[in-house]
Amino acid sequence: MADSVTVRQLVKATKLEVYSGEEYLDQRQVVLSDISRPGLELTGYFNYYPHERIQLFGRTEISFARNMSSEERLLILKRMATEDTPAFLVSRGLEAPAEMITAATAAHIPVLGSRLPTTRLSSLITEYLDSQLAERRSMHGVLVDIYGLGVLITGDSGVGKSETALELVQRGHRLIADDRVDVYQQDEQTIVGAAPPILSHLLEIRGLGIIDVMNLFGAGAVREDTTISLIVHLENWTPDKTFDRLGSGEQTQLIFDVPVPKITVPVKVGRNLAIIIEVAAMNFRAKSMGYDATKTFEKNLNHLIEHNEETDQNSSGDK
């Protein structure tokens, strides 16, 4: 988890324009993902002013400010420009009032702009800041994108996670991270995984060493990050352990208190794990779309049992 993000990093990531204060972009730090739209503050009410947030001015705020006198506008904007305020941001390609530039420059605050509508701009910046400021954890496993579904493969060392990922890449899927996966919570129900920068695009195969997946298979074989939708746990098969054969038992694993669906796949000589995991991802997607083969089978089986019981009863009655 990063404690802060510089305004320059924000500008680069979200493609913002710099109206003024280029020299302050590295000095100003963003510590909160929340954004403030200063409505009451423009009327002079500062009792609960969130000065440590980015101040976003949309069409409403700019229109209201233009109805003030120049002196009143400058006075209000100077009160808003505190030493903790990261930046002033103007949406919809609107022109920043001259008094905003003056007040911001005096307080060493950059003034930024974007052509995006206010709501979309707010969502874009909040999403970026959430991803950068969120708490991060490291998990042991391999993260692969299979048909657009983020699948986290876990299991003991030596069980075959990296080799399985390599075969999945050969089958056209994309690698995100091998061995160590950095995860963070994007929102209440979304967990995102990525590779640590030093391990990005790399895969370790016993006997071969470290291989660069992007150089060997091309840019289409890797991704920077993905939402973790499914966990596949590889476990060595033992005769005394019972594994779910029908897939009727639903498992989950908590990551940051978010339950992520999980299946356990027994590892045994001769089993093609890559194909099994690929099919598991497709089956999970089918369930998400409302089709569950297990439930369909159980329903048909129950109908068949009921039919056979009725047939037996009728046969007994005839006798």
UniProtKB/Swiss-Prot annotation:
Binding positions for ATP per the UniProt entry: 155-162
Gene3D superfamilies per the record? HprK N-terminal domain-like, P-loop containing nucleotide triphosphate hydrolases
The transmembrane segments are none
Important for the catalytic mechanism of dephosphorylation: where is this region?
A: 266-271
For this protein, the activity regulation entry reads:
Kinase activity is slightly activated by fructose 1,6-bisphosphate (FBP), and inhibited by inorganic phosphate (Pi), but FBP prevents kinase inhibition by Pi. Dephosphorylation of P-Ser-HPr is slightly inhibited by FBP.
Q: Where is this region: Important for the catalytic mechanism of both phosphorylation and dephosphorylation?
A: 203-212
Active site per UniProt = 140, 161, 179 (proton acceptor), 245
**A Pfam family reported for this protein in Swiss-Prot or TrEMBL:** Hpr_kinase_N
The lineage's top-level taxon is: Bacteria
* Keyword terms of this UniProt record: ATP-binding, Carbohydrate metabolism, Kinase, Magnesium, Metal-binding, Multifunctional enzyme, Nucleotide-binding, Serine/threonine-protein kinase, Transferase
Q: What class of enzyme is it?
A: transferase
Necessary cofactors: Mg(2+)
Q: Which Enzyme Commission number(s) are on file for it?
A: 2.7.11.-, 2.7.4.-
UniProt keyword Cytoplasm present = no
Name the SUPFAM superfamilies for this protein.
HprK N-terminal domain-like, PEP carboxykinase-like
**Binding residues for Mg(2+), per the UniProt record?**
162, 204
Q: Name one GO molecular function term.
A: protein serine/threonine/tyrosine kinase activity
Biological process (GO) annotations held by this record are: regulation of carbohydrate metabolic process
Q: Which family does it belong to?
A: Belongs to the HPrK/P family.
Q: What is known of its domains?
A: The Walker A ATP-binding motif also binds Pi and PPi.
What this protein is reported to do is described as: Catalyzes the ATP- as well as the pyrophosphate-dependent phosphorylation of 'Ser-46' in HPr, a phosphocarrier protein of the phosphoenolpyruvate-dependent sugar phosphotransferase system (PTS). HprK/P also catalyzes the pyrophosphate-producing, inorganic phosphate-dependent dephosphorylation (phosphorolysis) of seryl-phosphorylated HPr (P-Ser-HPr).
Q: What else is known?
A: The truncated form that consists of amino acids 128-319 exhibits in vitro enzymatic activities identical to those of the full-length protein, and also forms a hexamer.
- Tell me, how does this one assemble? Homohexamer, arranged as bilayered trimers. Six HPr molecules bind to the hexamer at sites that overlap two of its subunits.
Q: What is this protein called?
A: HPr kinase/phosphorylase
User: What organism does the UniProt record list as the source?
Assistant: Lacticaseibacillus casei
- What taxonomic ancestry is recorded? Bacteria, Bacillati, Bacillota, Bacilli, Lactobacillales
**Gene for this protein?**
hprK
